[in-house]
Swiss-Prot record:
Subunit structure: Forms a complex with cognate toxin MazF1.
Biological function: Antitoxin component of a type II toxin-antitoxin (TA) system.
Protein name: Probable antitoxin MazE1
Organism: Mycobacterium tuberculosis (strain ATCC 25618 / H37Rv)
Keyword vocabulary terms for this entry: Toxin-antitoxin system
Amino acid sequence: MTTYYYVLLSVTTWVGLRHEAKRELVYRGRRSIGRMPREWACRRSRRFAANGVDAAR
């Protein structure tokens, strides 16, 4: 029974990490293209830093 819970936890963690990495990749690509204004990108990255996403990098 413990193995089942461990597998479930690892799978959910892996999916969550993959989703986070994909979102980060999309955000980075959009920023590198420069489609959005620079001040908005700065504000968004600052909000991410406050949320702890940048700290996890």
